[in-house]
């Protein structure tokens, strides 16, 4: 049974085409992975099928009475609401039914016998619905899902406007799961989640009976939970049955076959054109030349899609620093309250270290404390000599209206326009991306612009806070290679073991230092 049908979808932004006459279907029970490079239109597609964005052309048709739940990381949480308020809002339709039930009860005393029968029937229907959807144990359900995603550690009475990006993602995901929609649409749900909660979400999706569409660049996660792949590339959307690894094999074979057919056809075209050019003027061979020309005119010419530029990150190593990058003595980090026990840590020149642990226990706070961006509650942190620090923040807030070119030029005013464009292209951005405002780019494209700033300055220590969030597979692979080749020190926060395990020499588990219950 088809739950969603998309036919002849065409859409673009200005002169940048995203989709050209594509089709899509979602069948009952399908677990679909929506994959493609940054900027190919995955989030745009989800916004179109949910009605948040009107396509230029095409037909989107959902089955009747289907409840769709969409995890959109750009959703704004209302100021003044607590985490508990947001989670309980998942049951707003049940609370509305309760209000209706109470209104009926208040009116029973004034009802006629005929009205009484109708009202009692409606009352019974409402009570059955409330019981069926566990209305009377909502608080227990909220606590159960909140615990599974680590929200109890944050505190359910905490104001949602005080939350980090990862914590907001958890709240939105928990609300979505509590709503129990017929269809889940998940846009990079593992971004900002720690390993423990990614594992929980993986188990949940593997056992999920209904259909879902998942956008994710976390390939091990994606591969375990999906059974259909839709691949976005060059304005096309193609369906593959099987997991991601099977898709890679089939895609590679199809690409090789197309390239071989293209080469054969180009050879044939060259030979036909040569024959026509040599023989069209001679009376004895003119008819044969005309026949060859007709064949050329009728030929369906194979076109190879333009290759997207693959990122080639390479960090520039500056001067040699002193032996120690930093040393802390009895350092207690936090904002209003301590997040850690007293920490005495040191990092030496050339070391590459990963910081791991659950969200909210102080990994980002530790980085900012080392950099001096926030004051320590107590203790000291002493930076080493001759440091050239490169810092990649997890979140950059604000509505950036500058173009990518302007963004890099502001950072490197001595660059020529050619050097600016070349630097952005090496980070995997096309000409149209380069000339666009940063704010209209996808999360992955914005991350590439920020990485462009980092790779073009001399550094000897990199502090990277979740740099893989939003990055596509090619960009992650290139970033991993760049970190392996980098001669300097690296302090890295990352929730993807398959990314950091080959890069670092040591892993610091922040859960051993935190004062929070986890």
Whereabouts are the PLM-identified features?
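Post-kinase regulatory C-tail/linker adjacent to protein kinase catalytic domains
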Residues: 313-315
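ABC ATP-binding cassette signature C-motif
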Residues: 1-260, 309, 318-518
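Intracellular alpha-helical coupling/juxtamembrane segments of multi-pass membrane proteins
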Residues: 250-305
């Amino acid at each position: 049974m088809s739950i969603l049908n998309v036919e002849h979808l065409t859409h673009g932004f200005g002169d940048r085409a995203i989709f050209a006459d594509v089709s899509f279907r979602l069948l009952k029970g399908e677990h679909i992975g929506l994959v493609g490079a940054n900027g190919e239109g995955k989030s745009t597609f989800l916004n179109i099928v949910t009605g948040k964005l009107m396509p230029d052309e095409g037909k989107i048709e959902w089955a009747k009475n289907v409840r769709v739940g969409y995890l959109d990381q750009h959703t704004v949480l209302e100021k003044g609401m607590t985490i508990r308020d947001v989670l309980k809002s998942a049951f707003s339709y049940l609370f509305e039914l309760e209000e209706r039930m109470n209104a009926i009860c208040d009116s029973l005393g004034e009802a006629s016998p005929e009205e009484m029968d109708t009202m009692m029937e409606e009352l019974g229907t409402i009570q059955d619905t409330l019981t069926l959807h566990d209305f009377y144990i909502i608080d227990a359900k909220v606590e159960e899902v909140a615990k599974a995603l680590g929200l109890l550690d944050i505190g359910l009475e905490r104001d949602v406007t005080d939350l980090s990006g990862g914590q907001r993602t958890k709240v939105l995901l928990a609300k979505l799961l509590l709503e129990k929609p017929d269809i889940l649409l998940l846009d990079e749900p593992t971004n900002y989640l720690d390993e423990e909660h990614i594992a929980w979400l993986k188990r949940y999706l593997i056992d999920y009976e209904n259909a879902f569409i998942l956008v994710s660049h976390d390939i091990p996660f994606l591969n375990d939970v999906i059974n259909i792949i839709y691949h976005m590339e060059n304005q096309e959307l193609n369906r593959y049955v099987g997991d991601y690894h099977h898709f890679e094999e089939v895609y590679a074979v199809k690409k090789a076959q197309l390239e071989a057919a293209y080469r054969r056809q180009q050879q044939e075209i060259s030979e036909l054109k040569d024959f026509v050019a040599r023989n069209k003027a001679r009376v004895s061979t003119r008819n044969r030349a005309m026949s060859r020309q007709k064949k050329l005119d009728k030929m369906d010419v194979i076109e190879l899609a333009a290759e997207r530029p693959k990122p080639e990150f390479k960090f520039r190593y500056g001067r040699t620093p002193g032996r120690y990058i930093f040393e802390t003595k009895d350092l207690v980090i936090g904002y209003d309250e301590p997040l850690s026990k007293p920490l005495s840590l040191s990092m030496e020149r050339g070391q590459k270290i990963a910081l791991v642990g659950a969200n909210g226990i102080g990994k980002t706070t530790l980085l900012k404390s080392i950099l001096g961006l926030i004051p320590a509650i107590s203790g000291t942190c002493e930076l080493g000599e001759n440091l050239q620090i490169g810092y990649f923040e997890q979140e950059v807030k604000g509505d950036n209206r500058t173009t990518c070119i302007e963004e890099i030029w502001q950072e490197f005013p001595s660059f020529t326009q050619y050097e600016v464009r070349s630097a952005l292209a090496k980070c995997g951005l096309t000409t149209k991306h380069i000339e666009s405002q940063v704010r209209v780019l996808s999360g992955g494209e914005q991350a590439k612009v920020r990485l462009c700033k980092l790779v073009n300055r001399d550094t000897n220590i990199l502090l990277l806070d979740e740099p893989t969030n939003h990055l596509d597979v090619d960009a992650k692979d290139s970033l991993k290679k760049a970190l392996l080749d980098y001669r300097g020190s690296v302090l890295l926060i990352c929730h993807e073991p398959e990314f950091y395990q080959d890069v670092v020499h040591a892993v610091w588990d922040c859960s051993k230092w935190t004062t929070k219950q986890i």
